[in-house]
A protein has these predicted regions:
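N-terminal hydrophobic/helix-forming segments and targeting peptides
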Residues: 1-371
C-alpha cells in the first residue's frame, strides 16, 4: 500500500509543473472519482450524499462531500494546503543576449535557495491568455514545454576561487537562464513569445499575456539502499495537496460537509484572491450552506463547530546539522506526521486542535511527532 501511494505521489509530482497544472490534475482526479463540477459564479443545486468541486480564479480548488444525513448547521471539516512553491517566473519582454547566448529575464517567487537552481535542466509551464471575442474574458490555456529548454550556468571555479567559501547570487545577473546559442544577427525581440505561440499552436499576436514559472525538469525518484527517501522538486507543498485530495476522494462521512481546499500564493503571503488570506473560502462555504437550505445563522453555526487542518511540510532534523533543530520538539524523516505548534501563532494550532489530532492518531495507530 505504501509503495502504491508512493508511485501515485511521484506521478502527481511529475504532473504538477505549475500551480495551474496542479489544479488541473486535481480536477482530473475529481472527475475520475465522480465529483460534479460547479461554477464559481453560477447557482448551485446540491444534494445530500453528493460530491462536488469548484475551481476559483484558476489555481484555487474546493472539493467537498455532503453527508448523506446532513442537517443545516452541522460542522464543516476542512483540510487545506497550498499548491505554489519557490521558483522563478518569466518576465514580459524577457529576451536578453550576452556571450553568444539568448537568455531570459526572471523574477524570484517566494523564499529561494538560488544555488540549487544552477546547472540543472529547466523547463517552463503555466497559463497564457489569448484574444477572444469578449475582451473581458480572454481565452485561458495551460502550456508546458515538457522538455528542458533552459539552464542557469554556474561560474567555473577557475573564475570564482572563493565559491566554496560562500557566494551571494544576484537574481538579476547570476540567475538568468540561457535558452539558445545565437549569432550576431539574431533578432531577440519577440523571440520567446514566438516559441510560446509555436507551443500553443496560435499566432504570436494572439497571445495577450502569460503567467509562466520555471521548473526543475528532473524527475522524482526514490533513493537510499532501501529506497526510503524520496528526492523530488516541489515536495513543498505538492505532497500535502496529494494527501488532502486522496482524503476527500475516500471520504464517506454521513454528517456535515467535508472539504479539501487547495490555495495558491502561500509562498508570498496568501494575500491574493486565490490565497488563504482572502474572503473566497468563506464565501464559497456560505454558498454551500445556502444551496443546502441553511440560514445565515446556521451557516455561522457550521463555522463555529467546524475544524480545519492546515497542511504543509515540516523541516526534518538535518543529519549534518542536528544542532539547528529544537532540542525536544523536532521531526525525523520516516518517523511519522509532524504536528507543528508555535506559541507566537505562526501555525494554525493550539492545545485543543493538537489534542484532537493526537486523539485521531492514537485511535488509528498513526505515528506522529511534535514539531
Amino acid at each position: 500500500m505504501i509503495k502504491n501511494n508512493t508511485a501515485d505521489l511521484i506521478s502527481f509530482l511529475e504532473k504538477s509543473v505549475s500551480p495551474y497544472h496542479t489544479t488541473a490534475e486535481a480536477i482530473r482526479l475529481m472527475d475520475e472519482s465522480g465529483f460534479t463540477a460547479l461554477e464559481q459564479n453560477k447557482p448551485w443545486k446540491l444534494e445530500k450524499g453528493g460530491n462536488y468541486y469548484v475551481k476559483c480564479f484558476g489555481t484555487m480548488l474546493i472539493a467537498f462531500h455532503v453527508g448523506c444525513e446532513y442537517v443545516p448547521g452541522e460542522d464543516f471539516r476542512l483540510a487545506a494546503c497550498h499548491v505554489d512553491w519557490p521558483c522563478y517566473y518569466i518576465k514580459p519582454n524577457p529576451e536578453q543576449v550576452s556571450g553568444g547566448c539568448a537568455k531570459l529575464s526572471i523574477e524570484p517567487y517566494g523564499g529561494m535557495i538560488h544555488n540549487t537552481w544552477l546547472d540543472r535542466p529547466l523547463s517552463a509551464a503555466g497559463m497564457i491568455t489569448l484574444k477572444s471575442d469578449n475582451v473581458l474574458a480572454p481565452e485561458r490555456r495551460l502550456v508546458d514545454f515538457e522538455k528542458p529548454i533552459l539552464t542557469i550556468p554556474n561560474l567555473a571555479i577557475h573564475m570564482n576561487r572563493s565559491v566554496n567559501k560562500g557566494v551571494e547570487l544576484n537574481p538579476n545577473k547570476d540567475m538568468l537562464p540561457i535558452c539558445k546559442s545565437v549569432e550576431q544577427d539574431f533578432n531577440k525581440d519577440g523571440y520567446f513569445v514566438s516559441k510560446l505561440a509555436e507551443l500553443a499552436g496560435v499566432a504570436p499576436e494572439q497571445i495577450l499575456s502569460y503567467d509562466l514559472c520555471i521548473y526543475n525538469a528532473e524527475k522524482p525518484m526514490l533513493c537510499g539502499f532501501d529506497e526510503d527517501f524520496l528526492t523530488s522538486p516541489r515536495l513543498d507543498n505538492i505532497t500535502s495537496a496529494f494527501a488532502v485530495l486522496y482524503g476527500i476522494v475516500n471520504c464517506n462521512r454521513a454528517h456535515g460537509v467535508t472539504a479539501a481546499v487547495l490555495f495558491d500564493n502561500e509562498e508570498v503571503g496568501s494575500g491574493t484572491k486565490q490565497g488563504a488570506d482572502s474572503a473566497t473560502l468563506g464565501l464559497m462555504l456560505e454558498k454551500i450552506a445556502c444551496a443546502l437550505g441553511a440560514s445565515r445563522s446556521e451557516y455561522i453555526d457550521s463555522l463555529a463547530s467546524g475544524f480545519m487542518l492546515s497542511c504543509d511540510v515540516a523541516h526534518a532534523k538535518h543529519p549534518n546539522h542536528a544542532e539547528l533543530s529544537d532540542a525536544s520538539c523536532n521531526a525525523v524523516m520516516n518517523k511519522g506526521t509532524a504536528l507543528k505548534m508555535n506559541y507566537e501563532q505562526r501555525y494554525a494550532t493550539e492545545a485543543v486542535g493538537i489534542g484532537m489530532i493526537e486523539g485521531i492518531c492514537a485511535k488509528y495507530s498513526i505515528p506522529y511527532q511534535r514539531f
